[in-house]
Amino acid sequence: ISATVWQNWGPNTANTWRQVPELAGGGFLFDTGAHMLNTVVDLAGEGFAEVAAWLDNQGRPVETLGVVMGRLQSGAWVTMHACGETIPSCASDVRVFGDRAILRTGIWGERLEIQRYGRGHLRKVSVSASLGVWEQFLAVRRGEMPNPCPPEVGLRMAALYDAIRASSEDGGRPVRVQPEEAS
């Protein structure tokens, strides 16, 4: 899995609560980047075994740049890149590379494309229209549909973010994620 998110987050959030560590809890990777972390963890369907990360504040009170490399419990590799210091924009690209196909999506699910083995390019995948966040929440609550993102995904994301912070604070040293934290 390879994921990238970019936005002119640093300049846009200067002098706001988003760049006050005690209020925000983190910077770009914890804000817009959290959508990337959640998407990757959800697509992976399993926890991380090991993570190495580097975060850079670019002179700001919180991080605005980040690079993450990780290995899933199955051994599959993951790379993530977060750039909050770029031209006015907010976009992403997430790819899952398999031996039979490549999937492409975004961190907000704004597209789904597939390139199958033997095909020359990505093709759009038709999906049902979204119910909308609140309608979907209510349908799950009423038992009309399964939760599309159960709590375990959030727990795996929290374990990933903790490992990213720990690795970055130790100069990018790889950090092992405990199985109970990752699953």
Give residue ranges: language-model regions:
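Mobile, glycine-enriched helix-loop/loop "lid" segments at the mouths of ligand-binding/catalytic clefts
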Residues: 2-7, 102-105, 113
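Active-site donor-binding loop signature of nucleotide-sugar glycosyltransferases
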Residues: 3-5, 82, 125, 179
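Contiguous beta-strand/loop segments that form the cofactor/metal-binding neighborhood of enzyme cores
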Residues: 37-111, 132-147, 163, 176-183
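Glycine- and charged-residue-rich phosphate/anionic-cofactor binding loop of Rossmann-like
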Residues: 122-125, 140-157, 172-174
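Active-site loop of classical SDR/Rossmann-like NAD(P)-dependent oxidoreductases
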Residues: 123-135
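C-terminal hydrophobic helical "lid"/dimerization subdomain
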Residues: 154-168
